[in-house]
């Protein structure tokens, strides 16, 4: 929780191996509860089945393609995972790649629609590589950062 709380005013969250939301800081909680996602909910289910989430993301096709690649990468890293594979298969049936893999940008920001404004955030994801506790080893920490000045200013004003 220390890392998540210190990341305010920007969103930060922790998810488990199957993308269930385990913890979130104040900014992430505000962002996610606005689209119906709460602690304990599956971010995979939200990405696959929530019109509220999809409609709140301006660049959903780009983000969906990024999620698809991420799911396949995580499953391969784990030596195969039926839950991640099923989610990737479902998403692959719905999403057409927006660009060839060779031309994908290094960072795909997620652009959220928040009323009349658009908040553009990019993420870094960290995982504990030397954890002795398997539950801790399965946690991924996602720290979101503003991708533009407007987004930075909105988060600073809300939490300042």
Language-model features: locations:
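Short beta-strand-initiation
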Residues: 7-10, 105-107
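Residue-level signal for the start and early helices of compact helical domains
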Residues: 6, 23, 39, 103, ...
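PAS-family sensory domains
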Residues: 2-3, 8-97, 114
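Amphipathic alpha-helical interface segments
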Residues: 74-75, 79, 93-160
């Amino acid at each position: 929780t220390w890392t998540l709380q210190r990341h305010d005013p920007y969103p930060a969250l922790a998810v488990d191996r199957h993308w269930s939301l385990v913890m979130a800081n104040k900014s992430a909680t505000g962002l996610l509860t606005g689209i119906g996602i709460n602690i304990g909910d599956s971010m995979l289910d939200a990405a696959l089945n929530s019109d509220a989430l999809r409609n709140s993301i301006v660049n959903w096709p780009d983000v969906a393609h990024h999620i698809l690649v991420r799911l396949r990468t995580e499953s391969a890293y784990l030596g195969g995972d039926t839950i991640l594979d099923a989610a990737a298969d479902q998403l692959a049936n719905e999403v057409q790649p927006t660009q060839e893999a060779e031309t994908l940008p290094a960072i795909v920001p997620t652009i959220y629609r928040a009323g009349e404004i658009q908040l553009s955030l990019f993420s870094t994801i960290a995982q504990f590589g030397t954890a002795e506790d398997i539950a801790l080893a399965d946690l991924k920490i996602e720290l979101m950062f503003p991708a533009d000045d407007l987004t930075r200013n909105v988060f600073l004003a809300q939490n300042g």
